Amino acid sequence: MSPASTAAEAGLIDVRTLAPEIAVDMRYAGPNNFTGRVVPGYLAPRCYLLRPAAEALARVAHALKTAGYRLQVFDCYRPVRAVHAFVAWAADLQDQSTKPQYYPRVDKQALLGDYIAETSGHSRGATVDLGLLDCRHGACHAVEMGTDFDFFDPRAHTDAPDISGVQRAHRQHLLRAMAIEGFANYPMEWWHFTFRPEPTPQTAYDVPVD
């Protein structure tokens, strides 16, 4: 793990300094997430990425803007301490308070491994979770993707068969836009993309998001 103690030392930058049109809805900086509370390590709702990934994401955002769309980010760089908090939450089988919203069809004991990992590519600073906003007709609104972010369910798989044709087309729109700039999708989560090649594939960071 990197000894860096600040985002600047780690080489992490706020993506909105490059693309202010990106909408930020950092779920783990508030209680609107599967743990039901602010996640350790998130002191502010900022999207940090290593510069190569941030610059690539800015290019995606600029291209989508010309077509009337905006990116909406839910998570970007994730401190290691946050990953540990997720693992601890998944191991606490007594806490089922968010099951109806986030994992109604999956047993919580199945989340660890399949959906929540003990290490995360997010901690390496080149992975982002996001969706699309449609701004073509005035006020922006979220593009329907078939599930919400962090919905632990097979329907969140990018190629899930039990979503509508319109929802599938929306997922493919996002997939194509991200792929052009080198982002690879994680097939179990339509929202999850990693910039390739990763700038620091062997290094995780634990600096706070502040």
Question: What are these model-predicted stretches?
Answer:
Residues 193:
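Conserved metal-phosphate-binding beta-hairpin within the catalytic cores
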Residues 1-76, 80-188, 197-210:
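Extracytoplasmic cell-surface/polysaccharide-interacting catalytic and binding patches
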